Structures are given as C-alpha cells and as structure tokens.
Amino acid sequence: MIDVNKFESMQIGLASPNKIRSWSYGEVKKPETINYRTLKPEKDGLFDERIFGPTKDYACACGKYKGVRYKGIVCDRCGVEVTTSHVRRERMGHIELAAPVTHIWYFKGIPSRMGLVLDVSPKQLEEVIYFAAYIVIDPGDTGLEAKQLLTEAEYREEKAKYGNRFVAKMGAEAIRDLLKQVDLDKEVTALKAELQTLKGQKRTRAIRRLDILDAFRNSGNKPEWMVMETVPVIPPDLRPMVQLEGGRFATSDLNDLYRRVINRNNRLKKLLDMHAPGLIVQNEERMLQEAVDALIDNGRRGRPVVGPGNRPLKSISHMLKGKQGRFRQNLLGKRVDYSGRSVIDVSPELKFYQCGVPRPMALELFKPFVMRELVRRGIASNIKNAKRKIDREDDDIWDVLEYVIKERPVLLNRAPTLHRLSIQAFEPVLVPGKALRLHPLACEAYNADFDGDQMAIHVPLSDEAVAESRLLMLAAHHILTPKDGTPIVTPSQDIVLGNYWLTQAEIGREGEGMIFATPEEATIAYNNGDIHYHTIIGVSAASMPKKDWGAGHEDSIFVTTYGRLVFNSLFPDDYFYINEPTQDNLKQPMADKYFLEDGQDIQDKIAEIGQDLVATPFKKGFLGDTISEIYKRYRVQRTSEYLDDLKEMGYSASTISGLTIGMADIPETKTKDALVAEARKQVKQVSKMFRRGKLSDKERHDNIIKIWTDCKDAVQQEIAEFKDQKNPISVMQQSGARGNISNFTQLAGMRGLMATPSGELFEIPVISNFKEGLTVLELFMSTHGARKGMTDTALKTAQSGYLTRRLVDVAQDVIIREDDCGTDRGITAKAIVDKDAGLIESLYDRLVGRFTNRTIRDPQTGEVICSKGVLMDEQMAQKIVDAGVQEVQIRSILTCNTSHGICRKCYGRNLATAEEVEIGEAVGTVAAQSIGEPGTQLTLRTFHTGGVAGAEDITQGLPRVQELFEARNPKGRAVISEVDGVVDKIESNAAEHLQEITVKGKIDTRVYTIPYTAKPAVQEGDEIHRGDKLIPGSIDPKELIKVTDTLTTEEYILAEVQKSYRTQGVDLADKHAEVLTRQVLQKVRVLDPGETDILPGEVMDIAEFRDRNRDVIISGGIPATAQAYILGITKAALETNSFLSAASFQETTRVLTDASIRGKNDPLLGLKENVIIGKIIPAGTGMPIYRDQVPKADVQQPDSVYSIADLEKKMEDENKETESK
C-alpha cells in the first residue's frame, strides 16, 4: 500500500477546462441551495447530494438504502451514492459557462500576466474584456493591424468597408483566441534577438515578457487556460449553510457569489437561445465576467459586491489571505484536542521537572487512559460503564488516575510563545483547586508571573510524542537559553534574597572563632543557639575528603561562616568549597588566605580576613554563575537537583531572615535640600542670561536640563553610598533580589526630570520622592511619562512580534544537514569595537563554541596553542586570549557550503546543550527566535545625538535591527570610499554649501561631496580602504557590497546587529545573527547570461546559479556572470523556493499567481510547507536519516552458533551473490 504521507514534492499549475471537468462530480445548474421546508438540498443546486455526496453517512437522499452494507451503490431512485458524508468536503462540482471569462488574478495582477503574454497594456485589456472596445484578431488583407483596438463606431466603419475580410471581437472570447494564437517558441526566439539592441524601459519590459513566456513554455501550461470556460464549485462542506434559532440561515459568502454566477450564466444561456440582440448579450456577458471576478477576488476591480449591512463579501482569495485566511488560521495553527487552559499559581514544593495539574482537569485530559485502565483492572465491566464512573467522579477512579499519569509528561505553553522555551514538558502531579501549578524557576523561561497569567496544557498521545517530550522537552533539560548559552533558570526574588542573607558575615556575632571538626558539629552548635548563620567559624578541611583543597591544605582549618558552610552542602561532594563569589573560586580551590597557618590563632585570622568575608555575600549574578559551572561539570541531572536544593535553601533562609519593608527602612538624605537650593540658584542664573540675550532658547533649555540632571546624580550618589547590611531595602537591592539604584533614588532621594508627551524633558523636575509624596503638579507631570511608557511597550511588542515572524519565515528551512561541508573558507574573528560605544563583543565571546579553521600559534613563542578543526571550549578560548592572539580564523555559517542548510562544523556548539550541534537541529528557527525574543527589550526610539553639528539622527534599537535585516536605506547614511588609496584633500565650498573629499587611488582619483555641516571621519593623508566611512553614520549594505565583497558586507551587518543588542544589555550569540545574515545574502543578480538559458537581470539562488554555470562550463560554453544581491528578510521570505511557505507569509494571491504560471515545484525542504500539508517536519527526529531507520528483528533461530570470522565470510559470500545477480 502506498504511504500517503511520503511524497517528494508538490506542484501547482493552471487548470485547463478539461481538468476542471475531470475534478467535477456533476454540473451545478441552479442557484438554489436547500429547500426551506424540508431542509433537503435542492436538485442540481449548490448543495445537491447527487453531485457532492450524501448529507447522512451511508444513507441515500430518499431513504431507500441505509447502512454500510450498501456502500458504493448509487440509488436508482434519487441518484445519490451511498457513502460517508465526509465526501462532501472533497467532491467538487462545476458550472459550464455560456461565454468564456478571464481569470482576474492573471489579468489584474501586477504585472498583468495576460498583458505581458499578448504585449497589450492592462488598460487596453480591460477595455476589451469589459466590452468597451473591439480587438483585431485576424487583420486579413485589410489595412488593420493585429491586436489593434477599435471603438464601436470604428468597428462598424471598418465592417462596412471590408465586410468579413477581418476578424475582431470583444470580451474574454477575444482574449482567448489571441492567447491561442501565441507561438511561445517563436516569441521567445524573437525576444532574445531583440534584447541585444534594446535599452532602458523597453529592455526591462522585454525581459519581463521573456520571463513569463519562458515560464509558460517550460511549465507546460497553455496561455489560453488563463481564460475560463468552466468554473469549479468547491465542496459544500467548505462553504456551509447552517440553521440558526428562529428558522433563519447563516451561509458562507461564497454561496451568494456562486448564486450570482449561476443566475447570470443561466440568463445568458436563455438570451443566446432566444437569439437576443448583440448589445443585450454583451451586457449579460459583461455581468457574468464581473460575477466570476467577484467570486475569485471580490473588490480587486471596481467596487466590491456587498452583502447585508454593506459588508463586502468574502471571496475565494479572501479565504486564503491574511491572519484569518486558510493558511495562517487553519493550516499553520490548528486547535487541538486533549488540551486545556487555566490560571497559573506558584508551587515551591514541586521538583524542577514537575507541574501541578488540577484533579478535574487531569481527569478530563486523561479520560481515555483512565477508562482503559478501569476496564483492565476489572473496576468497570466495559467502556460505557467506565465513562459513567468518571462522570460521577466515583472514589475508585482517583487511584487509577494517579497510576495513569505516571511516566506521561504534559506540555505547558504560555502565550506569547516568543521562543522554544515557551513550551516545555513536565511530569504532572495532581493538586487540589482549579489552577495549574508552576515551579518558580520555570517562570523566567516563560516570562510568567502569578498576577493572573494563564497557561495552556497539552497531552502528548503517541509513544513517540511521549518519548520526545521526556527526552527532549522536559524542563530539566532546558537549563541554558539558546540565545547565548547562559542559564535561563537563574533564581530570583526570595531565593536570591535568602541565599544572600545566608552567606552574609558579621564581625562579633555569638560563637565567633569556634572551630569544628565536621559540618555536622557546627549544625549541632547552631541548633543549640551557640552560633548564628553569620558567625565566622573555623572548620577542618579533612572532614570533606572528596573536595580539592589545593596543595598542602587537606588537613588544614579554614575560616568561613556557618551560612556559607550550609550553602556549600548544596554542591556535589567533589566540587570546590566556595568561600568567595569569584570566577577563580568557581574554577579552582579556595584562596590560601582563608586557611589557618600552623599555630596561628583563629581570632588573629578573623582580624586579618574578616572584612573580606563581610564584603562578599553571594549575589544574584554569582548564583547564575554557579549554575553554569555545575552544568558544565555535571550536566543535566545533577544541575536539576542543585536548582531544587538552591530553591529550597533560598525560601527557607528568607523565611528565617524575616526581612520585611517598612517606611522607616527608607533612609533620609542629608544633602538633598542643599543640592536642590544650589540647582535653583543656577537655573535662575541661566534664565537671567537668556533674558539678556546671551543664550539661545535651546541653550537655555539644555543648560537647565543639565543642572537638574547633575543635581539628581549627586543625590543618587549619596544614596548609592548607603550600604547597610542590616537595612532590608538595601539588602534587597544589593543582592539583586528586587529593585535597582534608580528605584531606590526615587524612594529616598528625588524623582528627577520627567518626559513630556513628545519625548522632550520638562524643565521643572519632580523634587519630592515617594516617601515624602508628590505635589499635585508633580503627579500630573509624572503621568505623561507613565502613559508614554505603556504605549511604547504595546507598540514595541507588536513591532517585535512582526519582526520575529519575518525572521522565522526567512530562516525556517535552515537545518543542520550534514557533518562537514568540507569548505576551507572561514572568517577572521576579532573583538568588535565601536568608536563611540567602546568594546561591543570580546574575542573570547566570539571564539567559545566555534571550530578553528587554521592552527593557532602563540605570537611570542610560536608554539601551537590549538590545532585546526578543534571545537574551542571556554578554557581553550581563554588560553588563546591570554596568549595575546588578536585574530583567529574560525569556521563560520557565512562561508558554509551546505545547500539548504548548514553543516555541524560551520555551526559549532549548540548553545542550549553546550555540546556540538546535532544533525537535524532547526538552527534557523532558533536563530530567528533568539533575535526576535529580546526585541521587546530594545528601545523603539530614533535618538538624536544632541546638538552636535553634522550629527545625523542615528537609528538604534529595534528600528536599527529592522533596517539592517530589511536592507533598507539607513537613516544618517555614511558616504563610503569606492577605492583603496589616500585622502588627498578636504575642501569646504561655502558658496554651494558643500565639502569635498578627494581620495587618490592607485588607478583613479575620486571626489566625494558631503554636506557642509557634516564632520569628516577622515583626515588629510589618512590611508583608507574600499568601504571605509568618509563621514560618520550607518553604511548602506547595498553600497558596501558593490565596492567590497559579500563576506565584508556580512561581517558589517553582523557587527551592527551585535552593536544594537549588546549596547542594550542583551547578549546574543554571533551564530544567530550569522544564520540570518546568510539568508539575506543568498541570491545573485545575473549581469550577463553567457550561453546559459538564464535571463539578464534575473535574481536567483547562489547554489542554483553555480549548478547552471557548471553544466555550461562542462559542455564548453560561456558561463553567466552575476553580482551578489542583497534582499531584505520580507523579500527573501517571498522569494524562497517553496511557494507554500511564501504564500502563507504575505501577498498570497501574487505568490500563487506566479507559482501557477511557472508550474512551480515545492521541494518541501522547509518546516512551514510540511506543516501546511500535514507531514512531519524534516528537522529533529523528523529528519529522513532518523525516520527511515527500521529496527530489525531476527526472527529465524540460527542453526548453529557462528564465530565472527564465519559471519564475515558469510556476509562476503552474500555480497558476491548480489553483485553477480
């Protein structure tokens, strides 16, 4: 039997009239739908059971045949086939048109496909199709020309003159006849010859025509099929009609549109039978043409057909388009069974891989499993009985439910699903109530809080789905974020606060200086009240023999606090003792200074290093570092345990600490009043100078803003110096649990300057703080900023979501396809430094997790640090940086040779697992999510670099990222040099308000004009290279690629993307930006086709271009030449090889029109196109190499036991046998 789900590709084409008839199960002749009294479909109508199949399963319309046993019989009385009613979703009908009509997509699209084939302008076409003019089809021996347009009067005149010696017609029939006459081969040859001489607009049009004629020739579609003689009628269940209460009917708009077509068609038939006058027939034909236009794409031409309440009717095109269309609503995202949603609540007692599911919800979700188990155990006699027990919620079902949910993970998802960590698997635990329970550490990945957030739950049903959920999606595996490889499960709030308080030290606490032989002894002393968590004590290192204490310290006494001793009990036994929050202590034994020297008194040691302990409680960032380090050393299982222990410890310690906030905890500032008085004095001074005309209004404004900003900074400085380890607010802020210095300043100092609705700053600051309370005016001023903040956030979310969608669409088919593409190319990695922003990304960051492409040697000694083809880990990268190496050749995604994807060696390490990436990993989607997800954290504004002459508006944040990936002309564009050379002179031309920079190259000299106000970025005598900036600003990648090469442009885009993210505090891995940059530069534009069959100016994939050239070179011809072509992500997503993916993205009708004319073949390589047609996606476990592995079971018992040598000989013999066959 054929596997319906196994096909290589999917093709689209134009349907010929005969093809439409072959799909059809019968002609729809009447506009009737269903009989309003009997509610039965009318005969020959739009819902006819004879055409479309029975409305009831296995029952004909008249009731003569009922039941499965009559399957396949056609009733002799009513003519309905006995089969399932499901066929009403599949069977099509057709309408035989009395006159041909054009298909609006091919006539009205831009460019008009019919117009190009016939070489007639769209305006003229419209006149002919809608019966405003005649077109000459065959001029005969008259003086007329073919395709000449004649008005009614001219036609009569010519007819009187020449009689029947020429043929001219109107309407779609004329267009059909002309299209039939087109000889594609002849036209293509003629056009190719013409192209040699044509220039400008004519050449562009000729290339367009050639492209479309070539498409028809190669696809096997005939041009006349763009004119329809029959209209297909889609299955009735896809355009349903349902009865509402009160006897009225709700129907799909398509039925109304079909009825219009049928009515007009029937009227036209009648008029033709009656031999009505030509004018009346023409009018009816025009109305039929308009009815079919409205059916296919209502509103494309003229005013749309409206239904009740002046609402435009939804045509077939509208059914496909947009978010509510068939593609995005029903094919890419479906509603699924075995799912639920509820409010979430926190549950600190859960393990990291667990979630709480309310009992009633679990019972409903796992109902079939519970029913089966009830029957299996004999608690219920059959399934019906089991269902009844569940509905009644009998006592004996709960044990069965507990048993059933063991080993069956569920998926939890929170919208918006910004990245793959927004869906994770958990093992369900039954909980009372109605809320889903979530582990506190899972919140970060979901960006969830418990102020009313809701989450959806899904049950994986098949064994494969369960296995994937457990092995790949379980929350315990998602410790690192794919964005940059850092832990995403960093503790927050109470957990941070508790562990910070636990690891604090205090001089002079009870029991200070006590020495304990083992940690257990210290615990007894704590329980007896002899010591406190913050007490500094001594402990014998010998009590923890598995730890690495460093040379000679195995039997020493070390100084620590009891709290830190307890904290260290969370770590594995063989991990270092962490006594101070430093990177050194995480990677090597504790510093020597904490050990007692022989004979040294512990009190002396405390006097010496006590302050070091006091100054170093463990903050939030350090807790994250410990998770990272434990993950690197011990992997998933142990890290998951550590996280749960850390959570328990944090909650327990913050409970014991009893930290709370009161008004009294907000400190008073001593200097604020004096600082404010001084600022007011300075403001008065500035105003005075302005009144005397010594300052412009802008200078006055800027000065006042600066005075108040300085004042607020001084107040903030005083508050920042307030570090009281006993003050709860201070402890919360310093530990990283909640709040930052700015919040603290607003509580205790002053709020400072506020923004106006336009984004400027008010000159009057808010002097009060929240402890004192604001005046009415101050409160009013604050509201502008608050509202603007809310609006900005809402806008940013939408912008960022749309960016993510475009990124995913362009990168979704980038999958790791092979182990090594074998390229010897790579990129030179060096630190990314910006003139203004300083260091953007260090060399170390760029090396970790990448493969070397050349051997790396020490610049001083010349010894090999790392050989070629090695995956660099943190230690190796640090070693390279420490050796003083400035540049390293690495394998890169930008230079990978794998087609339709990337190889493992060019990608390097998978950031989410810290291992080398696996074949099948969907790295494109991950890259798109990693760039899109932090989009909401970037700013939305275009900053104006204040008052500097010549400084343009520089775009930053989200708009800048969009500008780069969409390849738009950047704001504040920099002029770049097109030659290598020296800056000869810089001159100002005051008369023309210009400056001129002369660059002297080796071959020619170039003069660049720049604005008079711009400040040149070069000086006379500077040596510069192609692509270097002459004035500050953003380089346009399209210009850069013309003067340099693809790789330089890609590296520029990469550096700029990193600048946008890292300056906003978002660490993004290079490889994600590389994946998308590669996608934007996948195409080339053909300059000279040589002896290939490519068209000049055609834009095509680099891989396809190489293949076409290879074929020509092999046969000894002249290859084509092309230049790199940069496409924005939207364009690139629409230009993809998959028409399904492009059509479901944007401009659905345009994509489908083009694809059908070209007879496009979708190779189904990406993810979206496979989701659309319901196939398993070709990534991850859906990769053919994983799917096609069939576990072999040897059923035959061996006659005797073979040795290895026997087996090898047997296999050799079998191979020879098959070869001889």
UniProtKB/Swiss-Prot annotation:
Binding site for Zn(2+) 1: 60, 62, 75, 78
SUPFAM superfamilies xref list: beta and beta-prime subunits of DNA dependent RNA-polymerase
Native organism taxonomy: Bacteria, Bacillati, Bacillota, Bacilli, Lactobacillales
Domain of life where this protein originates: Bacteria
Gene3D superfamilies xrefs: 1.10.132.30, 1.10.150.390, 1.10.1790.20, 1.10.40.90, 2.40.40.20, 2.40.50.100, RNA polymerase II, clamp domain (4.10.860.120), RNA polymerase Rpb1, domain 3 (1.10.274.100)
Presence of keyword Transmembrane helix: no
Residues annotated as binding Zn(2+) 2: 821, 896, 903, 906
CDD domains: RNAP_beta'_C, RNAP_beta'_N
Catalytic activity: RNA(n) + a ribonucleoside 5'-triphosphate = RNA(n+1) + diphosphate
This protein's encoding gene: rpoC
Protein name: DNA-directed RNA polymerase subunit beta'
